[in-house]
């Protein structure tokens, strides 16, 4: 490990194993672009406040931009002997601009520096993930628009319950995605707060202008308390919670695709573009994409639980434990982005619904039983009485190996005299679905209206995409 800015206080060098354990350069290098931007803004603020000369600030900013260029072209790759990204950048800066490079850290601590870097990084990642969500939502909207009148069994307890429009089913996931976008947008507001200038924990005696730095970096507000500013990782937890919910929603859809692609359901087939085979069984076509998305969900949950556990016992202010915030959030963001991208491709070109199988599926069960009860309700029969009547009818059908449509009207009247020939039209799957026309229901008119509202919301979130 090379000498560090704090080594003057110590007589003995750090044990190599401890140095390696202490170092974060192996993962916090991901923050380098944001560290460079934050440092450049800090240098400009120091000159603006009269702490550095304009010439000194220009030298610092020029050196930082040189490091950025070297990083992007692969010329600058800090080794593992560096403690962290901040020291690696500072050391290279001194090599490039000389002694003035040592002035960059004036009125700044790594504590407020890393908080600034992480917020800048997360702000950009949130924007990227919201963009990915937008593309995913667009794919679901387009798919749903093609299947307003395609019927599919609806389930509760994984038992067939009532038939629904396939578009209505897909709209449920669009609603989940809408909440995900709203959550991330709200979290971004709390991320977009500048802690730079808080120092190690107590601020600084130098006449800095924190508002100036915040404006340069695009922050909309300043942190109000220096102790809280350097130790706050609420925004990390919030992001990990939001990422976990996105993963939950993708995992639920993945589970359904896995089920629907199975021989037991056969509601859809997987295309060759989004499936894999078996190394042993030549007939297999495996749903690897949704399985991996489902698997990554547990890993994202783990990062959330890990961060909560790190924070639960920390006294104010900064503690080294907070170094553990980065690997989890970096991995969670990557996992969510890759899952959204893969699921978008899967929904766009990886599945083909089987309309004949779906049409048959809604005809072969008792999912129209509730509508038979509603038929009696419309005839003036109390619902609880109607419920009992239809329960008895279903029990009779099960013993007779018949469906509701198979019973002659005379048998229906044996159970209740209010039944008439118009019953059969009332319990066909298409009639059953179309009749559920309450707001938010699966009736075709309601589904078309819901698609219109979802489309309007999508265009509100992504106006530039809507223009193309």
Swiss-Prot record:
GO BP terms in the entry: arginine biosynthetic process via ornithine; L-arginine biosynthetic process
A molecular function (GO) term: argininosuccinate lyase activity
Catalytic activities: 2-(N(omega)-L-arginino)succinate = fumarate + L-arginine
Entry keyword Iron-sulfur: no
Protein family (similarity comment): Belongs to the lyase 1 family. Argininosuccinate lyase subfamily.
InterPro entries hit by this protein: Arg_succ_lyase_C, Argininosuccinate_lyase, Fumarase/histidase_N, Fumarate_lyase_CS, Fumarate_lyase_fam, Fumarate_lyase_N, L-Aspartase-like
Signal peptide limits: none
Pathway stated in the Swiss-Prot or TrEMBL entry: Amino-acid biosynthesis; L-arginine biosynthesis; L-arginine from L-ornithine and carbamoyl phosphate: step 3/3
Lineage, opening ranks: Bacteria, Bacillati, Cyanobacteriota, Cyanophyceae, Gloeobacterales
Entry GO CC: cytosol
Subcellular localization: Cytoplasm
Superkingdom assignment: Bacteria
Protein name per Swiss-Prot or TrEMBL: Argininosuccinate lyase
Annotated source species: Gloeobacter violaceus (strain ATCC 29082 / PCC 7421)
Keywords, alphabetical: Amino-acid biosynthesis, Arginine biosynthesis, Cytoplasm, Lyase
Pfam families tied to this protein: ASL_C2, Lyase_1
Top-level EC class as recorded in UniProt: lyase
Gene3D superfamilies on file: Fumarase/aspartase (C-terminal domain), Fumarase/aspartase (Central domain), Fumarase/aspartase (N-terminal domain)
Enzyme Commission number, as recorded: 4.3.2.1
């Amino acid at each position: 490990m090379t000498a560090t800015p704090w080594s003057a206080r110590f007589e003995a060098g750090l044990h190599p194993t401890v140095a390696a354990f202490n170092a974060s350069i192996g993962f916090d290098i991901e923050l380098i672009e944001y560290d460079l931007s934050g440092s450049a803004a800090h240098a400009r603020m120091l000159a603006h406040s009269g702490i550095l000369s304009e010439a000194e600030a220009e030298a610092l900013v020029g050196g930082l931009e040189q490091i950025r260029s070297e990083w992007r072209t692969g010329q600058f790759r800090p080794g593992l002997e560096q403690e962290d990204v901040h020291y690696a950048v500072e050391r290279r800066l001194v090599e490039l601009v000389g002694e003035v490079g040592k002035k960059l850290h004036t009125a700044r601590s790594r504590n407020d520096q890393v908080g600034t870097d992480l917020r800048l990084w997360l702000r950009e990642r949130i924007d990227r993930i919201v963009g990915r969500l937008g593309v995913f939502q667009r794919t679901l909207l387009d798919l749903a628009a093609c299947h307003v009148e395609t019927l599919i069994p609806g389930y509760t307890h994984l038992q067939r319950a009532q038939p629904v429009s396939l578009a209505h089913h897909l709209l449920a996931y669009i609603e989940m995605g809408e909440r995900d976008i709203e959550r991330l947008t709200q979290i971004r507001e709390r991320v977009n707060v500048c802690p730079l200038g808080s120092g190690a924990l107590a601020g600084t005696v130098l006449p800095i202008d924190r508002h100036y730095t915040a404006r340069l970096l695009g922050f909309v507000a300043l942190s109000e308390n220096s102790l809280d500013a350097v130790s706050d990782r609420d925004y990390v937890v919030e992001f990990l919670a939001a990422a976990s919910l996105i993963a939950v929603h993708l995992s639920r859809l993945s589970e359904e695709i896995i089920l629907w692609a199975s021989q037991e359901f056969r509601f859809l087939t997987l295309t060759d573009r989004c499936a894999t085979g078996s190394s042993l069984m030549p007939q297999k076509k495996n749903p690897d994409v949704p399985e991996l998305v489902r698997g990554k969900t547990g890993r994202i949950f783990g990062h959330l639980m890990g961060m909560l556990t790190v924070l639960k016992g920390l006294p104010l202010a900064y503690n080294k434990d907070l170094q553990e915030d980065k690997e989890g959030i970096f991995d969670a963001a990557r996992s969510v982005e890759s899952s959204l991208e893969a699921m978008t491709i899967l929904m766009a070109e990886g599945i083909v619904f089987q309309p004949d199988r779906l049409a048959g599926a809604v005809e072969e069960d008792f999912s129209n039983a509730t509508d038979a009860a509603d038929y009696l309700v419309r005839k003036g029969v109390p619902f609880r009485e109607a419920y009992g009547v239809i329960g008895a009818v279903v029990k009779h059908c099960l013993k007779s190996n018949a469906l509701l449509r198979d019973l002659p009207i005379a048998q229906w009247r044996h159970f209740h005299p209010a039944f008439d020939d118009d019953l059969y039209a009332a319990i066909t799957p298409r009639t059953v679905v179309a009749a559920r026309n309450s707001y938010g229901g699966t009736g075709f008119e309601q589904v078309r209206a819901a698609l219109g509202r979802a489309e309007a919301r999508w265009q509100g979130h992504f106006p530039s995409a809507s223009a193309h």
